[in-house]
Amino acid sequence: MRVAFLTYSFSMHINIKAKYFSKSNDKVYFFAMHPRQRTKDLDAPLEYRNNMVVTQLIHDDMDWEQIIKNTWKMFGTIRKNKVQIVHIIDMAFAIYGILLSLLGVNVILENNGSDVILASNDPKLRKRYEVAYKLCRGVVQDSYVAQQAGIKLGAPSTNNEIIELGIDTSIFNLNVEKGVFKEKYNIPKDAKVIFSPRTLRPLCNIGEIIDTIKPVLEQYPNTYYVFCSQIRNITYENRIKQEGLNNHVIYLGYIDNEKEMPYIYRDSDIVISIPNSDSSPRSVYEAMACGSNVIVSDLPWIGDKFTNNKELYIVKLHDEEELLNRIMNILSGRTEINAEIAFNGIKQILDYRISEKKLRKIYTKIIRRKNDKRLF
């Protein structure tokens, strides 16, 4: 099967998608969209893309000339290599779904979560999404929340599947060696580590996490906060510097999701993920599989998947007092998740091999019906 994925060039999770298609007759292509304002680090992630053919493209949502150039370049690659499916991850790239579909390409659209959850009040986005949904061959997403948000924006209710992102539990598990991350970044062995794996942007409420640094350091001065994001945020960085917290904050740039991230989770006493909206956050699942004490905001994606105070900790959105209390209780040792139960729960429902089978089934169905003009 010949498959091409299209999403942000700095996507930390594209490798797991490529892993779905590692059989001898599979070939994976990656159209890596790079924001124009970040051309200085254009090739940063390339060293991590060993199992796919990468085409890096500059993307500017307002530059139609560039969008047309990108489309023709991708179409040339698709036609030359007989790519059977183009899987577009994140509706931010819906325009390419429209253009490639009009050129006869089999396009799958993937609702990424916030892209559809937060788009409801933008008329231009709604129209673009509606057209893309109408032309594509199928829609996938990782949660019921994202699926319903997409349907409200025009996604069809048929050929519309929920497929969890999936994680490789042979990589993310309780046997990951401890101390590797701390040693690499010269963090004392007995230090506490609080890790935020989310992008440094307001949606992820990074400011609320920063608010906890001072009070935590007052009681636990040997604590380090680690932020992982390819995208820098000068506002947050300046605030941390002005408040004299630099010596207790570590910024990580692009991190290989499978070669490096497991060691960060394993050495983290706490992993925090408290965005305003979310769908099915794989960083949360990975951290849980590695035995981390994970704190999440009370969003609909959780549903009945996990139990509060057992596999993870749930705090009310924007309740900074509750967040701080959770952190303090964990650092004091008064509370701790059941790592074994958390890992087993993840393995049973979220191992990537389960997702692989589901996605292959959808692709195969579309390829077999490739002579149909539309499926909807």
Where are these regions (language model features)?
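Glycosyltransferase donor-sugar binding loop
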Residues: R36-Q37, I167, P197, Y224-E237, ...
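Conserved donor-binding/catalytic core segment of Leloir-type glycosyltransferases
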Residues: I187-C204, I210-I213, V226
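Short alpha-helical donor nucleotide-sugar binding micro-motif in glycosyltransferases
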Residues: Y263-S268
